[in-house]
């Protein structure tokens, strides 16, 4: 079977679709009446040297720490210890598999750069998109490793700096065109930090052109900080009671911000004042789409075993129409909400059901198009992606366009050894559930 796309990303005019399958990125471009493959990149980095370097550093640290504990002869002379060769640790029997993820695809604001994060070396990878190259549009600019795994990525408003948030709560800002920094902690300090895993990051500008950085974390926090003086906190947006997984800032409003995550609501904020404007409760809407996939882990179940947990995976918007779209992780439904631009109130506008579970969601801002990727494990003949166009005031599936796109995708991936897998070898597709905190995290 073909591996589902873990992530999809459209550029602003919808002419480029970027897809992640396991540890490779594919780029499909609209040409004529269909799509063609215009770029591909595989993360084939061997991280063995990186692991060995860490082992050597740890051995050196232990030698220094234990220097005073060396065995000594009766004369007080230290006993020479045999030197140990650094060995790369290998997972033992029963150890969980190690996946070489590519995650967090993003485009620069001018659409000329593609950003991605790799798990193999905890790096941000930056590509120039060269549409003049008919063979491969991906031109690697730099690969910047970080101390901890990147969780979210964007660029500054002028696209000069890479903004990256990691799983330990630190945010880094680095010039995109500068050389790779070999030792980040020594050469580049974080510009701000949370005391919790960061889940999303974005940038804002006010009417005076001042930049702000917005960060969300696992501990219900949304922080708005000045940029580049990010040590100055402008405000916090308080109201979430569970983790925040996604934040969305529409271009058609100069004050609204939307967020969601482990709560049963989609939140609407005035980011300028910090006011919570509206909470859209989707609890009743989602009930019939929940399955055994949403049962809480056994150790957190009640006696009946019917505790369910679910969360919003992604919110997106469009350029100049007051709608937002979101989906709940591991469900087969996409909700479109209408936004009152003055009050920030949210109301259900459209419900779109699909035969398979949604994995990821993106939008082409300028052409009012949504794109989803689907989990095809239960139906290997289903489309891996679907495009939905706003016609009038409703989103309509573009069946002819989708058929052309899927023909290109299937023919492209037919002989791709990475993309063709057994159903049991599919990478984990749903990650939000692991963000939820239970009693064990508070004890």
UniProtKB/Swiss-Prot annotation:
Q: Which SUPFAM superfamilies match?
A: WD40 repeat-like
**Where are the WD-type repeats located?**
97-137, 193-235, 239-279
Cell compartments where the protein resides: Nucleus
Keyword rRNA processing appears in the UniProt entry: no
SMART domains (UniProt xref)? WD40
Q: Which UniProt keywords apply?
A: Nucleus, Repeat, tRNA processing, WD repeat
Looking at the record's lineage, which domain of life comes first? Eukaryota
Q: Which GO terms describe its biological process?
A: tRNA (guanine-N7)-methylation
Kindly state one GO CC term assigned in the UniProt record.
nucleus
Q: In which pathway does it act?
A: tRNA modification; N(7)-methylguanine-tRNA biosynthesis
Principal subcellular localization = nucleus
Does this UniProt record's set of keywords contain Magnesium? no
| Start and end residues of each stretch annotated as Disordered | 67-93
Tell me, in a sentence or two, what this protein's role is. Required for the formation of N(7)-methylguanine at position 46 (m7G46) in tRNA. In the complex, it is required to stabilize and induce conformational changes of the catalytic subunit.
Q: How does it assemble?
A: Forms a heterodimer with the catalytic subunit TRM8.
UniProt lists the family membership as follows: Belongs to the WD repeat TRM82 family.
User: Which protein are we looking at?
Assistant: tRNA (guanine-N(7)-)-methyltransferase non-catalytic subunit TRM82
Q: Which organism is it from?
A: Kluyveromyces lactis (strain ATCC 8585 / CBS 2359 / DSM 70799 / NBRC 1267 / NRRL Y-1140 / WM37)
């Amino acid at each position: 079977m073909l591996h589902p796309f873990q992530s999809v990303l459209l550029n602003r005019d919808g002419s480029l679709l970027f897809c992640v399958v396991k540890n490779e990125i594919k780029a499909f471009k609209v040409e004529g009446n269909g799509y063609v493959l215009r770029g591909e990149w595989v993360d084939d980095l061997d991280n063995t040297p990186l692991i060995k370097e860490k082992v050597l550093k740890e051995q050196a640290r232990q030698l220094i720490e234990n220097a005073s504990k060396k065995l000594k002869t009766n004369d007080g002379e230290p006993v020479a210890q045999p030197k140990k060769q650094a060995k790369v640790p290998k997972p033992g029997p029963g150890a969980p598999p190690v996946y070489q993820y590519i995650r967090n695809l993003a485009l620069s604001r001018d659409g000329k750069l593609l950003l991605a994060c790799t798990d193999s070396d905890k790096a941000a990878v930056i590509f120039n998109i060269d549409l003049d190259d008919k063979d491969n549009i991906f031109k690697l600019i730099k690969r910047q490793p970080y101390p901890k795994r990147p969780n979210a990525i964007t660029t500054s408003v002028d696209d000069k700096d890479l903004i990256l948030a990691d799983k330990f709560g630190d945010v880094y800002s680095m010039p995109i065109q500068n050389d790779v920094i070999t030792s980040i902690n020594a050469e580049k300090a974080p510009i701000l930090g949370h005391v919790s895993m960061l889940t999303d990051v974005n940038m804002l500008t006010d009417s005076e052109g001042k930049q702000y950085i917005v960060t969300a974390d696992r501990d219900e926090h949304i922080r708005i900080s000045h940029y580049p003086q990010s040590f100055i906190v402008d405000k916090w947006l308080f109201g979430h009671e569970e983790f925040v997984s996604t934040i969305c800032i529409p271009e058609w409003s100069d004050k609204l911000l939307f967020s969601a995550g482990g709560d049963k609501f989609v939140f609407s904020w005035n980011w300028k004042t910090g006011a919570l404007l509206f909470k859209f409760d989707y609890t009743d809407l989602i009930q019939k789409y929940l399955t055994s996939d949403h049962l809480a882990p056994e150790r957190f179940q009640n006696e009946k075993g019917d505790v369910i947990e679910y969360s919003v995976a992604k919110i997106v918007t469009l350029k100049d129409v007051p709608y937002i779209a979101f989906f709940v992780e591991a469900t087969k439904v996409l909700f479109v909400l209408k936004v009152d631009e003055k009050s920030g109130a949210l109301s259900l506008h459209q419900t779109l059901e699909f035969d398979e579970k949604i994995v990821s969601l993106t939008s082409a801002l300028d052409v009012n198009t949504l794109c989803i990727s689907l989990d095809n494990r239960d139906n290997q003949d289903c489309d891996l992606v679907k495009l939905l166009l706003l016609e009038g005031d409703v989103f309509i599936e573009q069946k002819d366009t989708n058929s052309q796109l899927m023909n290109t995708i299937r023919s492209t991936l037919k002989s791709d050894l990475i993309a063709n897998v057994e159903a049991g070898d599919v990478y984990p597709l749903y990650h939000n559930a692991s963000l939820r905190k239970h009693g064990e995290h508070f004890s």
